From Swiss-Prot:
Protein name according to UniProt: Aspergillopepsin-1
Disulfide pairings: 320-355
Phylogenetic placement of the source organism: Eukaryota, Fungi, Dikarya, Ascomycota, Pezizomycotina
EC number: 3.4.23.18
Family under the similarity heading: Belongs to the peptidase A1 family.
GO CC terms in record: extracellular region
Species annotation: Neosartorya fischeri (strain ATCC 1020 / DSM 3700 / CBS 544.65 / FGSC A1164 / JCM 1740 / NRRL 181 / WB 181)
Subcellular location(s) of the protein: Secreted
Gene: pepA
Length: 395
């Protein structure tokens, strides 16, 4: 999964959301496969910047130690698992772009022909189709924890994912973009799958692609199967029973803030019996790490030999040779287990024997973020009816 952390500004007092128009056709379900993008040149990853971006995405405070580590580049690495990146092809206007699907935001933004040649070099870019409509006076802007950002104009255009097309879908075309995004040649933008109330277009928020097309689907849901070091899938409109074991366990979603937020009933570390300490958190495919309350994080790393919270590296680190315990989240009586190897995120620098943890503090956010470290172990159903989330171990 590409490390491409996003930030969404939570807008209070949103005005009426503008809906796009789905193409009328028989109800259906379809699967869209992520594609592996071989990285010809080793890609550097600033580990504390990834962490900082995740905190900023939800309005959290980035600790000074994390800021310092991110700015100094003390933990910049090119880990082997990023030899490939896993993105999803989407046809926007007349161009196919490789986008990052993000259940933690509600914007569809893309590299566009409004950027300079140097900014768009190496990227597939959105060119408004002949039938596209520019929304005069409408703008969007995002800002990230490492100081990067993007902004631009808004168009209504055709967007196709798998077997479903939305006409007059809001497309946020980048006209200004920071160098951090320009350098990520494998990613052409983002498709948000949170609730439309979170959309950041001004002066009037727009509907997400999923909210536009869900009336076309057999069921108004999508299911996510992210994989550990392999391409995953997104199923729209149906549940694929072949992709999980046993039965799905559902948790109610509180979408009052626009997120897929749920409450877990407890957690456990390694072979220990899970406790009953509740954890409220957001299921977010656009965040790489698993961010938890300080007490939970400390409990986990207390059982990791040699682990410490490092000011130098901006988070919990440990010897790479250490065998990590699993982390279990209890959801409605179901134990969702993240294997220990998923939590060994990456060496802090090339060739280092110290590794950065995939579990880190949420820095007092007040809720947890169940990012890819967690999601790669589960088949997760995002059901807009309820709304609710369904969980089961991957097959």
């Amino acid at each position: 999964m590409v490390v491409f952390s996003k930030v969404t500004a939570v807008v209070v007092g949103l005005s009426t959301i503008v809906s796009a128009v789905p193409v009328v056709q028989p109800r259906k379900g379809f699967t869209i496969n992520q594609v592996a993008r071989p990285v010809t040149n080793k890609k550097t990853v600033n580990l504390p910047a990834v962490y900082a971006n995740a905190l900023t995405k939800y309005g959290g405070t980035v600790p000074d130690s994390v800021k310092a580590a991110a700015s100094s580049g003390s933990a910049v690495t090119t880990p082997e698992q990023y030899d490939s990146e896993y993105l999803t092809p989407v046809k926007v206007g007349g161009t196919t772009l490789n986008l990052d699907f993000d259940t933690g935001s509600a914007d569809l933004w893309v590299f566009s022909s409004e950027l300079s040649a140097s900014e768009s070099s190496g990227h597939a870019i959105y060119k408004p189709s002949a039938n596209a409509q520019k929304l005069n006076g409408y703008t969007w802007k995002i800002q990230y924890g490492d100081g990067s950002g993007a902004s631009g104009d808004v168009y209504k255009d055709t967007v196709t994912v798998g077997g479903v097309t939305a006409q007059s879908q809001a497309v946020e075309a980048a006209s200004q973009i920071s160098s951090q995004f320009v350098q990520d040649k494998d990613n052409d933008g983002l498709l948000g799958l949170a609730f439309s109330s979170l959309n950041t277009v001004s002066p009037r928020p727009q509907t997400t692609f999923f909210d536009t097309v869900k009336s076309q689907l057999d069921s108004p849901l999508f299911a996510v199967t992210l994989k550990y070091h392999a391409p995953g899938t997104y199923d729209f409109g149906y549940i694929d029973n072949s992709k999980f074991q046993g039965k799905l366990t559902y948790a109610d979603v509180d979408n009052s803030q626009g997120f897929w937020m749920f409450t877990a009933d407890g957690y456990g570390v390694g072979d220990g019996a899970p406790n009953s300490n509740h954890i409220s958190g957001i299921a977010d495919t656009g965040t790489t790490l698993l961010l938890l309350d300080d007490s939970v994080v400390a409990d986990y790393y207390h059982q990791v030999s040699g682990a410490k919270n490092s000011n130098e590296y901006g988070g919990y680190v440990f010897p790479c040779s250490t065998k990590l315990p699993s982390f279990t989240t209890v959801i409605g009586g179901y134990n969702a287990v993240v294997p220990g190897e998923y939590i060994n995120y990456a060496p802090v620098t090339d060739g280092s024997s110290t590794c950065f943890g995939g579990i880190q503090s949420n820095s007092g956010l007040g809720f947890s973020i169940f990012g890819d470290v967690f999601l790669k172990s589960q088949y997760v159903v995002f059901d807009s009816q309820g709304p609710r989330l369904g969980f089961a171990p991957q097959a």
